[in-house]
Amino acid sequence: PFAYLSDKPKDMRKEFLSSIWRIRVGSVALPLQMIAGMKRGVFVAGKYSQRRHIFGPDQKPKPIISFRTQHGPILHALAQLSVFDAYAQHSIQYFKHPNVAAPVQHAIGAMLKAVLYKTSQACLFTLSERCGAQGLFENNHIIEAMLETRAMSIAEGDTLVLSIRMGPSFISFYVMY
């Protein structure tokens, strides 16, 4: 056996993984769209809750944002976004560090995806419910963000599979005594 363009690599798997380095970059970049979708959902649910009013016992209009069941999930999503923004920035900086090995870069992307996928799906579902039937309307973009999040979770494989694949890399990379 011989190679037409160069010598055959000693480790075919390592050669293959080094040739597809862009996948590691994408594994960090893609989940960032989930944060953008959550921000869009929070904005829409917040505006809807400020605009929609009901009449109280005193027959005065009251915005539904004043109810705990309405503002609670919106504030919870805002708190999550605050944490996710910081987590994403930290992950990006760590990913870009020149001394970080490829398996660790892959792990950073897989962890970011796993954390953001599960929480953004739950968050967007809750925000959609806070908007009633209007949460399902295409022009409000909440359901659209849920579908985009679902598509991104499928894009590089299920988070369980990514986590399982990541395990042997860490076991061989770090030796525990």
Could you say what each language-model-derived stretch is?
Residues 1-177:
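Flavin-dependent oxidoreductase catalytic core characteristic
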